[in-house]
Amino acid sequence: VYETLEIVKRKKPKECALIGFAGAPFTLAAYMIQGSGEKNFSKCVSFFKREERGFLLLLDKLADLTARHLINQIKSGAEVIQIFDSHAKIAATNNKLRDFCIKPVEKIIKRVRKEVRNSYIICFPRNIGINYIDYAANLELNCISLDQNVDRRWAIENIKPKNQIRCYQGNLDPKILAKGGKKMQKEIHKILKDFTGVNHIFNLGHGVLKETDPENIKELIKTIRDQEK
């Protein structure tokens, strides 16, 4: 990973930012315990309900390892790092968002910034709804990434990171990108309009679906860049 970052850093165009990333401790633990992806991660839920102390120890260890991994990415050329908590909704649903998601990520951020000052950090706690408010208010972020279910105007009015830096990333529905066409164009312009006047990084509300035509991605990028001219 680090060697790849160094190579890309040397060869990429100057106008392109190099973003490093890692899974958040809760999402990593969910996959480790479950053994694979599952909608409800039932084995993970059963484990943390039965062995919460052990689960917290696991999250703490994963926070240490993730912080080191991100620090190494920055030292290898990453200009921005993003922490993905794709399954944060499970913690939120069980009233454990603060203990299972916020506190471990807070530890990561503090570790990273202690060793690499002024690090630019984006966090993505997917599908936590109104809990975005509490999540952002307790973390010193440079940017908060929004899933496609978040109302953008509501986000601008209500989601305020602890350090008051206001930047939003997102939140085109991956299904709309996969379909492409006029509906995609309409949604792109709507997103750009909704984020007018605030710092915004255009992105999807989650990952690119495997059935997405690469031409749709090219069209998306061209549309955004044409809008910026």
Can you describe what each PLM-predicted range is?
Residues Y2-K229:
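Active-site loop segments of alpha/beta catalytic cores
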